[in-house]
Amino acid sequence: MRQLRMAALGAAVVALAVSACSLGGGSQASKGTIASQLVLAGPPECPERPFCLEGLTGTYGITFKDFKATDAGGPITIEALENGDAQVGLLFTSDPAIAAKGFVLLEDDKQLQLADNIIPVVREDVLAGNPVIEEALNGVIAKLCQAALTDLNKQVTVDGKAAAEVAAAWIAAEGLSFSGGSGSVTVGSTNFYEQEIIGEVFAQVLEGAGIDVERKFQLGAREVVFPALESGEIDILAEYAATALEYVNNKAGEASTDPAATSDKLRERLADKGLTALDFAAATDQNGFVVTKATADRYGLAKLSDLAKPAP
């Protein structure tokens, strides 16, 4: 499923040296920082990528004791964190392992990563005929924080619950209730489980508002779902702001680390297709750096800039 976001994550995660390489010995600026005591685990390409180690050094002034080549947000990275071979690991920010393993996702407080915030993409004619759709979907988005998205993913992919069950429980817990809708819409998704889960949340909220909803999930890649949106085969899609923008603009490089600016540019690019993007969520699915709770507690880590503080 991860390849669905490879266009955005390729810029954020693409490759470096295949073996572990020492990164901490030469920089006097990094001596004595928390990072200089720790090993980073990530994909082999991480050291040379602007949204991975290169960016951590340039944006945060972080140099690690060592780098351990593992995988792109997968089980090898998770294992390295759990067995102590690494203390910091690159995962995706909504990876269910974060909730399942109790990892601490370090806040990207200097906005290193491109803004892949969750955002609904909707046909404009559907919104014009049913204003409650915008109200309801933006209501969902307002509640969708990072912890909520990660937990939804965990419940489906780790705990084995049905997406419909998980969506219904979350909607009830958040008190999401709307009315005044009519007619019918179709909610679609790519073949990525997370987009299907969010799509199910969208569908149930709209049904609660009085709208008949058809679900067309697991349609395929963006090369399938965007033509489906434009043709009217589907009306609503949960997307990622930066990734969606770079898809519709043919990789023009307009996405930035600013979610508001990226979302505005996405709306601009969608306008001539009869589509628009609604509000963006606080929740993202992009590169993220995690530590175990024990490491976070030991060093007082909550955000990436904490790694540049003097070691205790």
Model-predicted segments: where are they?
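Bacterial signal peptide processing site
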Residues: 22-25
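N-terminal segment of the mature folded domain
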Residues: 226-283
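Bacterial N-terminal signal peptides that target proteins for export
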Residues: 1-10
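Bilobed "Venus flytrap"/periplasmic-binding protein-like clamshell domains
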Residues: 30-78, 161-165, 184-215, 219, ...
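An extracytoplasmic/periplasmic, membrane-proximal ligand-sensing/linker region
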Residues: 45-51, 116, 131, 135-185, ...
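A ligand-binding cleft/hinge motif common to bilobed small-molecule-binding domains
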Residues: 79-105, 238-253, 262-266
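A conserved helix-loop-strand patch within extracytoplasmic ligand-binding domains
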Residues: 28-38, 123-128, 135-147, 260-312
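C-terminal motif of bacterial Sec signal peptides marking the signal peptidase cleavage site
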Residues: 15-20
